[in-house]
């Protein structure tokens, strides 16, 4: 987080009003219109209204309190992947409704409405790209699509991405954010836990690196499978990470849980994650970890008699 005023920019609504007073008065209607048009973003933690352009420049981390606001998959890819290196995978895969599930509405209708609203086919985007020049396979979950729930398409896309990474000998990074398995797909969604885990085991057997990044929230079947299978497990500050929800656990145990229960900081203290990395440092941290695990180039194998011959020649 920047400390000097120059880098902080228009950090709050008070700064904006101060600037407007200097540049001349504006109507209240215009001010309200600019807020409604998305020029401002209200921090869900401290309530400060920040200029959206400045907030995006700080990767949606509140300049006032450091709260990590939720970001969509498009923004996350822009933050991590080098320009003009992103190659999406399996964009043609679409979810279906094999169980003809219905709760308050048909699952097929819910899918169509969500797809039309946010422009995504399902809750994950996968692809190949580069981080600081290093090739990786990246999966990014999107909480806007039915709470980032894991259905058949999410499982299939992640599995195919991991298999491609194994074939190409790429490290895998998955940005996790999910409420868990998608109940509308029943057992089919639960099967994705085993399928993704099996693909990750083959990736591990090939001695390749896998780093999950746990963001707010990461819960349910995602936590119980691929989110916790990394060689190095990273988390964002204050992220909620767990299996069952806090309210469910409190009702089951009939006792109040600690305030920091199921937070990234609590999991770090108990050894369930390896490090907590602020979003503004995530790209460089991933690049450093991937670079450390790149295969070391060794000279071609040389038989003993050739070594002896070279040694004796040098001595002469």
Swiss-Prot record:
Q: How is the cofactor bound?
A: Binds 1 zinc ion per subunit.
What is catalysed by this protein?
N(6)-carboxybiotinyl-L-lysyl-[protein] + acetyl-CoA = N(6)-biotinyl-L-lysyl-[protein] + malonyl-CoA
- Biological or metabolic pathway of the protein: Lipid metabolism; malonyl-CoA biosynthesis; malonyl-CoA from acetyl-CoA: step 1/1
Tell me the residue numbers annotated for binding Zn(2+).
43, 46, 62, 65
Q: Name one GO biological process term.
A: fatty acid biosynthetic process
Assembly notes = Acetyl-CoA carboxylase is a heterohexamer composed of biotin carboxyl carrier protein (AccB), biotin carboxylase (AccC) and two subunits each of ACCase subunit alpha (AccA) and ACCase subunit beta (AccD).
Q: What is its main location?
A: cytoplasm
Localization (cell): Cytoplasm
Family from the record: Belongs to the AccD/PCCB family.
Q: SUPFAM superfamilies given for it?
A: ClpP/crotonase (SSF52096)
Keywords of the record, alphabetical order, are: ATP-binding, Cytoplasm, Fatty acid biosynthesis, Fatty acid metabolism, Lipid biosynthesis, Lipid metabolism, Metal-binding, Nucleotide-binding, Transferase, Zinc, Zinc-finger
Q: What does this protein do?
A: Component of the acetyl coenzyme A carboxylase (ACC) complex. Biotin carboxylase (BC) catalyzes the carboxylation of biotin on its carrier protein (BCCP) and then the CO(2) group is transferred by the transcarboxylase to acetyl-CoA to form malonyl-CoA.
Q: Which GO terms describe its molecular function?
A: acetyl-CoA carboxylase activity; ATP binding; carboxyl- or carbamoyltransferase activity; zinc ion binding
Protein name, per record: Acetyl-coenzyme A carboxylase carboxyl transferase subunit beta
